[in-house]
C-alpha cells in the first residue's frame, strides 16, 4: 500500500486544509504521524484487510546529499511510528525514493550518503520487504534517477549494478528496482525505464481516472502489452484533493474497486511470467 506520510502537526501542510470537510475526516481523527499508537492502529486496519506491505515515501534531507544523513525528510511515520509500533512485525515495509529534487550528482556520493543510510536503517531490518531474498524498493522519477548518475543509461546501469553487488555482499540475492511510471502510456517511456536497469514499473496512482474500473483495466492491459518490462498492477481509487483544489471529486465505488481486484486476480496475474 502506497502511503505519503504528511500528517504531523507543524510539518508540511498539516490538517488545516481538510479540517472543515467532514466527508474526508480520517478514521483515526486528526492524528500525528510518528506516534507508535497511530502506527499500530494503521497496521491493524491493513492486516485485517489483507494488506501486508507498507510502501512509504522516502525524502532525502537535502536536494544534493553531500554529508551523512542524520534524519530523512518527513520520516516520522516510519522512524518514530512503525519502527516503534508493538505490532510492526505483522507486516513488511519498503520505500519509494521520492527523488523529485534528484538528491545526488554522482555514484560515489550516492554510495556514501544515501545507499549506506538505506542499508543501515532499512535493508538490514528484518521487517524490510524482500522477495526471493532480493531487496524490493521503488523510485519516483526515472528521469531524475538517470540525471543523478550522469544523465546516461550507462551511468544508471552502473548504479544498479553496484546496488546488486552490495546487496549480495550483505547476504541478499540482489535488488528489484521499480520506477513509478509518471502516468506514461507509451512504449518509449517503458523502454527507457528498462534501459536504466529497472525490474519493472508501476503507477503511483491513476489520478482521477482511478475511480473508473474500466479505465484502470484498460491502462493495465495497454502498458503490459508493450512487453518492455514487468508492470505492477496498481489499484487506485481516484484523487479527491478537495482540501487543496476546492473541487470535490468522486472516489471509486466498492463495486468498481472489487471489479479491478478481481480482474487482477483472475485475468492479469495468471498471464504474467518471469
Summary of predicted features, one role per range:
Residues 1-274:
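Glycan-processing catalytic domains of CAZymes
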Amino acid at each position: 500500500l502506497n502511503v505519503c506520510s504528511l500528517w504531523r502537526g507543524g510539518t508540511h501542510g498539516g490538517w488545516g486544509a481538510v479540517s472543515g470537510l467532514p466527508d474526508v475526516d480520517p478514521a483515526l481523527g486528526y492524528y500525528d504521524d510518528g506516534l507508535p499508537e497511530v502506527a499500530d492502529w494503521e497496521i491493524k486496519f491493513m492486516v485485517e484487510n489483507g494488506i501486508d506491505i507498507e510502501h512509504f515515501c522516502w525524502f532525502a534531507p537535502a536536494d544534493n546529499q553531500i554529508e551523512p544523513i542524520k534524519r530523512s525528510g518527513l520520516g516520522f511515520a516510519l522512524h518514530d511510528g512503525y519502527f516503534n509500533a508493538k505490532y510492526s512485525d505483522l507486516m513488511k515495509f519498503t520505500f519509494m525514493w521520492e527523488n523529485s529534487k534528484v538528491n545526488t550528482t554522482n555514484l560515489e556520493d550516492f554510495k556514501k550518503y544515501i545507499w549506506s543510510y538505506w542499508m543501515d536503517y532499512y535493508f538490514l531490518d528484518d521487517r524490510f520487504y524482500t522477495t526471493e531474498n532480493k531487496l524490493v524498493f521503488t523510485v519516483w522519477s526515472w528521469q531524475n534517477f538517470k540525471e543523478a548518475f550522469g544523465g546516461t543509461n550507462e551511468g544508471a546501469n552502473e548504479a544498479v549494478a553496484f546496488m546488486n553487488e552490495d546487496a549480495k555482499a550483505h547476504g541478499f540475492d540482489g535488488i528489484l528496482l521499480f520506477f513509478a511510471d509518471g502516468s506514461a502510456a507509451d512504449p518509449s517511456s517503458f523502454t527507457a525505464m528498462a534501459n536504466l536497469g529497472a525490474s519493472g514499473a508501476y503507477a503511483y496512482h491513476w489520478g482521477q481516472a482511478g475511480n473508473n474500473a474500466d479505465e484502470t483495466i484498460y491502462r493495465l492491459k495497454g502498458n503490459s502489452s508493450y512487453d518492455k518490462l514487468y508492470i505492477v498492477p496498481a489499484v487506485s481509487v481516484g484523487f479527491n484533493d478537495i482540501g487543496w483544489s476546492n473541487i470535490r471529486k468522486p472516489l471509486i465505488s466498492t463495486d468498481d474497486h472489487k471489479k479491478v481486484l478481481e480482474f487482477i486476480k483472475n485475468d492479469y496475474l495468471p498471464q504474467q511470467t518471469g
